[in-house]
Regions:
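Non-heme Fe(II)-dependent double-stranded beta-helix
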Residues: 2-46, 53-161
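Double-stranded beta-helix
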Residues: 20, 24, 176-203
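A residue-level signal for beta-strand positions that form part of recognition/binding surfaces
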Residues: 49, 166, 183
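Short hydrophobic-aromatic micro-motifs
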Residues: 51-52, 171
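Short loop/turn segments at secondary-structure transitions that flank enzyme active sites
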Residues: 58, 144-146, 173-175, 190-193
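Short C-terminal domain-edge/linker segments immediately following a structured domain
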Residues: 82-86, 143, 167-169, 199-203
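Hydrophobic side chains in beta-strands
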Residues: 140, 171-173, 186
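Short, conserved beta-strand element in jelly-roll/cupin
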Residues: 159-179
């Protein structure tokens, strides 16, 4: 596997590789699914994403959520602190007010990444046990209000032109029923029509 260093001066989380002999699981190895049900698998193949309920213990999500509030120097019970000017500068200034929290390697994050149910879900998707983990940050979003609109933008967290394919996991730390809150956006059908879709995009 070759390392793509073209991005080395660009901030963010680019893909760690652009070539690989490995591909997503096509079930041809006959290996039994560990976490996904057959219904889950069919949904994954059709939509390009799948939801794993109760993937990690509630205690894991609670302690990480508490850490994020503390790291951002905000109080979950005091809305006045939610919209205060950030005390930390972000290298990618376009991410200001996007909810991204610059925390990557805390043990709480690694406990989630390595939790058996999470790991086994990825082994189902890849069809192999030896996985390479890339890391990303956490996210803490607040309701939009005048003067503090959500400034995130829909994007890929990897270069879709590269091989191998990438699969990203997202863990919701709280149940969210308000459609106006949250940082995740998904277009399920795009992975099936990407090649056609990109032909109609401006260069």
């Amino acid at each position: 596997m070759d390392s793509n260093k073209d991005h080395k001066d660009i901030p963010g989380n680019p893909s760690t590789a652009y070539s690989s002999k490995f591909h997503l699981n096509d079930r041809s190895n006959g290996k039994k699914l560990q976490i996904l049900t057959e219904s889950d698998w069919d949904f994954w193949v059709k939509n390009g994403y799948v939801i794993i309920p109760q993937a990690i213990p509630k205690s894991y999500t609670s302690r990480l959520a508490k850490l994020l509030w503390e790291f951002e120097e905000k109080d979950p019970d005091d809305m006045a602190t939610w919209y205060a000017t950030a005390s930390k500068d972000m290298e990618m200034v376009e991410l200001t007010n996007s909810g991204m929290v610059e925390i990557y390697n805390h043990q709480y994050l690694w406990d989630i990444r390595q939790y058996p149910k999470v790991y086994e879900a990825f082994t189902d998707i890849w069809g192999m046990d030896k996985l390479w983990v890339s890391i990303d940050r956490a996210n803490l979003n607040f309701p939009s209000k005048p003067g503090f609109g959500f400034k995130g933008f829909i994007h890929w967290d990897y270069d879709p032109e590269t091989n191998p394919q990438n699969v990203q996991g997202l863990v919701a730390l709280n149940d969210q029923v308000d459609e106006d809150v949250g940082g995740f956006q998904c277009i399920p059908e795009l992975y099936r029509s990407y090649e056609t879709w990109k032909q109609g995009q401006p260069i």
